[in-house]
Curated annotation (Swiss-Prot):
The keyword S-adenosyl-L-methionine does not apply. Residues 1-8 are cytoplasmic. This is Galactoside alpha-(1,2)-fucosyltransferase 1. It is an enzyme of class 2 (transferase). It comes from the Eukaryota. Pathway: Protein modification; protein glycosylation.
Length: 366
């Protein structure tokens, strides 16, 4: 056997060092390589086909109804990233959430909500969509799409992997095929449901003192709509005559109903709703900054009377039962009808009562 030269020994030592270094490198990066992220380590200048998605693992936001873990097991398997810009008030953001969920499922994409929407909805509902981190939102190459408020054929074939929706969608045509899933997403937290049911249990019919068996939630939208509807949209809000007719509709069809009135104008309601029959309860607190108490009350009722607005829509949609709504509440030439289709806003089985537009005709006179 030929003795190894000093040069051969040096080369062998260098080879062992190189192999050891490669082995160590592969060991420390084995998890990344196994989950598809090793490509960015080995070839940092090459774009990943599916970039990693960061989320907030916030308390009370499980990834799916069937898991108790708030964090995903494998975010690299996601197909695209869709979100929606949170805008407007409580009912608006419920509509945006439901529409995002439905359109993302329809197009085979993964839906995420932004932190502001989580802050608005998670204290009230057991929502399950994960939350997109701001740093991911800021560096994602979004294509933006503003939605109108009814389902369109083109929304069923959106090929964009990174899509940020916007607008004020709140039409059943987007999500009604997923009604049970939507109702599950908007399940009240236990303490809110129990508090609302406790209020209803304490109610008594004024004349007999009996506990009512049929509760009709009444939502009367006032506030800024008193100016916005006539001045901007050539429209009206529900008046006392409409509410009286709607209540009489329920009195004719249900035995001894009690009407649970909520509003952001409770003083007006007490002055304009006839409570002499003993079946009207002014139960709402009218706090616009914390609407969930009134909303919880409405959803625990059997039926609904709504005026206008997304808050009333969602109360009726989640409560089920019969719903009476204010119909034809704008003039025929209102710009509002360009962004609002009544047939897409109200379920076909709901009952509409025409609004009194005479105050608008008076305003239109020279």
């Amino acid at each position: 056997m030929w003795p190894l030269s000093h040069r051969h020994l040096c080369l062998a030592f260098l080879l062992v060092c190189v192999l050891s270094a490669i082995s160590f490198f592969l060991h420390i990066h084995q998890d990344s390589i196994r989950h598809g992220l090793g490509l960015s380590v080995l070839c940092p200048d090459r774009r990943l086909v599916t970039p990693p998605v960061a989320i907030f693992c916030l308390p009370g936001t499980p990834m799916s109804p069937n898991t108790s873990s708030p964090c995903p097991q494998n975010s690299a398997s996601l197909s695209g990233t869709w979100t929606i810009y949170p805008d407007g008030r409580f009912g608006n953001q419920m509509g945006q959430y439901a529409t995002l969920l439905a359109l993302a499922q329809l197009n085979g994409r993964r839906a995420f909500i932004l932190p502001a929407m989580h802050a608005a909805l998670a204290p009230v509902f057991r929502i399950t969509l994960p939350v997109l981190a701001p740093e991911v939102d800021s560096r994602t190459p979004w294509r933006e799409l503003r939605l109108h408020d009814w389902m369109s054929e083109e929304y069923a074939d959106l090929g964009d992997p990174f899509l940020k929706l916007s607008g004020f969608p709140c039409s059943w045509t987007f999500f009604h095929h997923l009604r049970e899933q939507i109702r599950s997403e908007f399940t009240l937290h236990d303490h809110l449901r129990e508090e609302a049911q406790s209020v209803l249990r304490r109610l008594r019919l004024g004349r007999s003192g009996d506990q009512p068996r049929t509760f009709v939630g009444v939502h009367v939208r006032r506030g800024d709509y008193l100016q916005v509807m006539p001045q901007r949209w050539k429209g009206v809000v529900g008046n006392g005559a409409y509410l009286r007719e709607a209540m009489d509709w329920f009195r004719a069809r249900h035995e001894a109903p009690v009407f649970v009135v909520t509003s952001n104008g409770m003083d007006w309601c007490r002055e304009n709703i006839d409570a002499s029959k003993g079946d009207v309860m002014f139960a709402g607190d009218g706090q616009e900054a914390s609407p969930w108490k009134d909303f919880a009350l409405l959803t625990q009722c059997n039926h609904t009377i709504m005026t206008i607005g997304t808050f009333g829509f969602w109360a009726a949609y989640l409560a089920g039962g019969d719903t009476v709504y204010l119909a034809n509440f704008t003039l025929p030439d209102s710009e509002f009808l360009k962004i609002f289709k009544p047939e897409a806003a109200f379920l076909p089985e709901w009952v509409g009562i025409n609004a009194d537009l005479s105050p608008l005709w008076t305003l239109a006179e020279p």
